[in-house]
């Protein structure tokens, strides 16, 4: 499996791009091909889908886009083409908010997504996807510019706590000064356990 391709985009078509990596051209299906700069060296994050008859690369400008694509693939009834179409037609913040807020009508606007598929997306992904910049925005709103605290909050989210739970801790933890990341994590876990 490939994580990314680092090469020159030599061809841009309506459904795909071609990335030249050391003389080998990789055809990569992407959501928005014209967002890639032609004849420029770029890193394209990829997912390789292998089936009985085919091997296909799906590409993304950012690792977060790839992660959201992979989450969509986990939904029963959503294949790579549908997931790519969803990513092509939306800003990720709106999509993630719709998933986390049970907004079926918002999800039905995507190609080939009916009420059942929309409900399945919500059922399978609610609480499992986060707004890409929500964590960064959360920390920017903090009253301190404390790197150890920021890292601790990110770690708590990585441990599986929701954005809302962690956001509630920010003020309490920011009142504690001169602490290491580990100490903030420990304090955060204690506060989360208290409920």
Swiss-Prot record:
<dbReference type="InterPro" id="IPR010994">
    <property type="entry name" value="RuvA_2-like"/>
</dbReference>
<protein>
    <recommendedName>
        <fullName>Holliday junction branch migration complex subunit RuvA</fullName>
    </recommendedName>
</protein>
<dbReference type="GO" id="GO:0048476">
    <property type="term" value="C:Holliday junction resolvase complex"/>
</dbReference>
<feature type="region of interest" description="Domain III">
    <location>
        <begin position="144"/>
        <end position="195"/>
    </location>
</feature>
<dbReference type="GO" id="GO:0005737">
    <property type="term" value="C:cytoplasm"/>
</dbReference>
<dbReference type="GO" id="GO:0009379">
    <property type="term" value="C:Holliday junction helicase complex"/>
</dbReference>
<keyword id="KW-0234">DNA repair</keyword>
<dbReference type="Pfam" id="PF14520">
    <property type="entry name" value="HHH_5"/>
</dbReference>
<comment type="subunit">
    <text>Homotetramer. Forms an RuvA(8)-RuvB(12)-Holliday junction (HJ) complex. HJ DNA is sandwiched between 2 RuvA tetramers; dsDNA enters through RuvA and exits via RuvB. An RuvB hexamer assembles on each DNA strand where it exits the tetramer. Each RuvB hexamer is contacted by two RuvA subunits (via domain III) on 2 adjacent RuvB subunits; this complex drives branch migration. In the full resolvosome a probable DNA-RuvA(4)-RuvB(12)-RuvC(2) complex forms which resolves the HJ.</text>
</comment>
<comment type="similarity">
    <text>Belongs to the RuvA family.</text>
</comment>
<dbReference type="GO" id="GO:0000400">
    <property type="term" value="F:four-way junction DNA binding"/>
</dbReference>
<dbReference type="Pfam" id="PF07499">
    <property type="entry name" value="RuvA_C"/>
</dbReference>
<dbReference type="InterPro" id="IPR011114">
    <property type="entry name" value="RuvA_C"/>
</dbReference>
<feature type="region of interest" description="Flexible linker">
    <location>
        <begin position="139"/>
        <end position="143"/>
    </location>
</feature>
<dbReference type="InterPro" id="IPR013849">
    <property type="entry name" value="DNA_helicase_Holl-junc_RuvA_I"/>
</dbReference>
<keyword id="KW-0963">Cytoplasm</keyword>
<dbReference type="InterPro" id="IPR012340">
    <property type="entry name" value="NA-bd_OB-fold"/>
</dbReference>
<dbReference type="GO" id="GO:0009378">
    <property type="term" value="F:four-way junction helicase activity"/>
</dbReference>
<dbReference type="GO" id="GO:0006310">
    <property type="term" value="P:DNA recombination"/>
</dbReference>
<feature type="region of interest" description="Domain II">
    <location>
        <begin position="62"/>
        <end position="139"/>
    </location>
</feature>
<dbReference type="InterPro" id="IPR036267">
    <property type="entry name" value="RuvA_C_sf"/>
</dbReference>
<dbReference type="InterPro" id="IPR000085">
    <property type="entry name" value="RuvA"/>
</dbReference>
<dbReference type="InterPro" id="IPR003583">
    <property type="entry name" value="Hlx-hairpin-Hlx_DNA-bd_motif"/>
</dbReference>
<dbReference type="GO" id="GO:0006281">
    <property type="term" value="P:DNA repair"/>
</dbReference>
<keyword id="KW-0227">DNA damage</keyword>
<comment type="function">
    <text>The RuvA-RuvB-RuvC complex processes Holliday junction (HJ) DNA during genetic recombination and DNA repair, while the RuvA-RuvB complex plays an important role in the rescue of blocked DNA replication forks via replication fork reversal (RFR). RuvA specifically binds to HJ cruciform DNA, conferring on it an open structure. The RuvB hexamer acts as an ATP-dependent pump, pulling dsDNA into and through the RuvAB complex. HJ branch migration allows RuvC to scan DNA until it finds its consensus sequence, where it cleaves and resolves the cruciform DNA.</text>
</comment>
<dbReference type="GO" id="GO:0005524">
    <property type="term" value="F:ATP binding"/>
</dbReference>
<feature type="region of interest" description="Domain I">
    <location>
        <begin position="1"/>
        <end position="61"/>
    </location>
</feature>
<keyword id="KW-0233">DNA recombination</keyword>
<dbReference type="Pfam" id="PF01330">
    <property type="entry name" value="RuvA_N"/>
</dbReference>
<keyword id="KW-0238">DNA-binding</keyword>
């Amino acid at each position: 499996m490939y994580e990314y391709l680092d090469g020159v985009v030599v061809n841009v078509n309506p459904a795909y791009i071609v990335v030249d990596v050391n003389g080998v051209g990789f055809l990569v299906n992407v959501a928005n091909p014209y967002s890639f700069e032609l004849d420029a060296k770029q890193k394209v994050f990829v997912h390789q889908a292998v089936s009985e008859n085919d091997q296909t690369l799906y590409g993304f400008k950012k690792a977060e886009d790839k992660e959201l694509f992979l989450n969509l693939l986990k939904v029963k009834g959503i294949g790579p083409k549908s997931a790519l179409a969803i990513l092509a037609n939306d800003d990720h913040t709106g999509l993630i908010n719709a998933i986390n807020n049970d907004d079926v009508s918002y999800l039905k606007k995507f190609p080939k997504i009916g009420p059942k598929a929309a409900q399945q997306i919500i059922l399978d992904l609610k609480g499992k996807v986060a707004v890409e910049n929500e964590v960064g925005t959360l920390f920017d709103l903090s009253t301190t510019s404390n790197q150890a605290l920021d890292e601790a909050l990110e770690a708590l989210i990585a441990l599986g706590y929701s954005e809302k739970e962690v956001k509630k801790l920010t003020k309490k933890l920011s009142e504690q000064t001169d602490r290491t990341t580990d100490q903030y994590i420990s304090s955060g876990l204690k506060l989360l356990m208290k409920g």
